[in-house]
Amino acid sequence: MKKNTLLLVIGAVCLAAAAAVYATGASAVQTAREALAALQEDYSKVQAIAYTGFVDLDSEAPVSLDEMLYFPVADSEVGTMADFRALLGRVYTQSKAAEVLDYCTGTTRVLTERDGRLYRADAYEPGWPIGPELEGAKWDGDALTVQVTLEWNEPVPGVVTLRPEGGAWKIDGIAQAA
């Protein structure tokens, strides 16, 4: 009788472990979907301002700085560098937000501020357009690694790392899949 009881206990433990693994996998995908959906509007605005340039610009008030032509950003929500930093902070972790800001103001120099207004160069980069479908997601400690499609001219597999910060899921990394 003890042998049968032991087998039942082992079977129950294995079943519980399998259910936990399945549930974790399912909840990772669901959590990723919900997190990316919550970020979508702000993420799209970051893409427009930081990369593609598909944001309203005031073409009547250009400024030439360091041999580049800039136009004031004509967006009701993002009109200053502080507004843009706040937008980045809603989408990205602190470290990733700093990286994106440095890229925009240093590496590519598409953004600058003058007299308290945010200015953008009239330039285009493809950015990181995340497709609507998730290919999968898995937990990595407290982070989520999400397989997505980056919708460039030719869609390619991508990986987004989401991490909780300040009570919300934020993007901590995004890259083309290896």
Predicted regions and their residues:
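Gram-positive cell-envelope targeting signals
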Residues: M1-Y43, L88
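Surface-exposed, charged secondary-structure patches
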Residues: R109-W152
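Short beta-strand edge/turn micro-motifs at domain boundaries
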Residues: T145, P155-A178
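Generic structural signal for short, solvent-exposed loop/turn connectors between secondary structure elements
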Residues: Y22-Q30, C104-V110, G141-D142, L150-G158, ...
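Intrinsically disordered, low-complexity segments enriched in glycine/proline and serine/threonine
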Residues: T5-L6, K138, W152-E154, G166
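Core segments of small alpha/beta cavity-forming domains
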Residues: T31-R114
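Low-complexity, intrinsically disordered/propeptide-like segments
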Residues: V9-G11, A18, A137, Q147, ...
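Long, acidic/polar, low-complexity amphipathic helices and coiled-coil-like
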Residues: K2-T5, T149, V160
